[in-house]
């Protein structure tokens, strides 16, 4: 799910203040602890080979995040592609691959246990 900043409802606007809120932005029920993550990614990075061996050869961990800069495209198990870019909020459900279209910096929040397993798998793939 991609949400452009301009599409997030303004709840309060005062001189020097704009507060926006997008409700129902995913459900973390049953996941336990969440980790905060900051990623710096170069254009051309593709997670497909790193996710080989995971269930469905995809990341099965959901992520909620914000794109500080750049552009990233995810592809789900059905082949559906969705791109996020600078200032977008995003939710990536389980079952995705990632391709970095333009150099990007993102902040993500992910279920800690599940994403640590994916990161550990990726580390093993690079050895």
What are these regions (language model features)?
Residues 76-96:
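Short acidic-glycine-tyrosine-enriched beta hairpin
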Residues 56-74:
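Short, conserved beta-strand element in jelly-roll/cupin
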Residues 69, 95, 103:
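ATP/adenylate-binding site constellation spanning eukaryotic-like Ser/Thr protein kinases
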Residues 65-66, 91, 99:
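Well-ordered beta-strand positions
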Residues 1-48, 55, 127:
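A short, N-terminal "cap"/entry segment at the start of jelly-roll beta-barrel domains
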Residues 19, 36-38, 64, 81, ...:
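Conserved hydrophobic/aromatic beta-strand scaffold that supports enzyme active sites
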Residues 48-58, 76, 82:
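Short histidine-centered beta-strand/loop micro-motifs
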Residues 3, 99-127:
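Double-stranded beta-helix
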């Amino acid at each position: 799910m991609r949400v452009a900043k301009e599409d997030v409802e303004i709840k309060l606007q005062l001189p020097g203040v704009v507060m926006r809120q997008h409700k129902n932005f995913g459900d973390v029920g049953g996941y336990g602890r969440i980790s905060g993550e900051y990623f710096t990614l170069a254009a051309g990075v593709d997670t497909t080979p790193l996710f080989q061996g995971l269930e469905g050869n995809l990341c099965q961990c959901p992520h909620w995040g914000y794109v500080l800069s750049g552009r990233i495209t995810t592809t789900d198990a059905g082949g559906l592609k969705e791109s996020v870019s600078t200032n977008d909020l995003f939710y990536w459900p389980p079952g995705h691959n990632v391709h970095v279209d333009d150099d990007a910096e993102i902040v993500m929040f992910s279920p800690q246990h599940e994403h640590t397993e994916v990161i550990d798998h990726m580390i093993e793939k690079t050895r």
